[in-house]
Amino acid sequence: MNNTVNGTINFAGQIVAQTMGIEEGGIIVQRPRSAGLTVSVNGSETQNGYVQLGAVSEVQLANPGDRAMPHQFNIRVAGIPEQYTHALVFFEGGATVDAATGGLINMAEAGNVQIQLLNQQGDIVQAGSHSQLVSSAFVPVMDGEVYASFAANFCSTGHATPGNVASKVDYTLYLFELAA
């Protein structure tokens, strides 16, 4: 039995000018099926899950470090053999991750904005950083299932300018046998 699950989470949203209406965007979650495991995101057990990210006014992201619109997403894995007691979701670095901030780089036309990941406690998750490997990041396996909650929000790197926001991040869910 392989003790990891790998996948990619694609993010989409929109920064709108103050006079425009708010339209909806979303997070597309893609992940492979692992033999013997059922993987779902927000209850969707299809190959691609969808989590609403939404849109935000540029006014809410006027200054560097401003954050807006946190949206929760969950990763659930079922069918885990009982030998595994804990899991850890690690968001990988890569071409779409800002190595300095761990934020997800916008690949669309909105300016001065990244997507920031948050853990269940609301702390910033720096994709690609080993700072994710802390004891509070381990999620217990209960009755053969693990349920990991995260959030994603917009984060300004300067005065955000209108346009679409799109990025993605790869993740690996590791399964562990930890002594009590």
Cite the ranges covered by each PLM segment.
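Mature extracellular/passenger domains of Gram-negative fimbrial/pilin and adhesin proteins
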Residues: 1-180
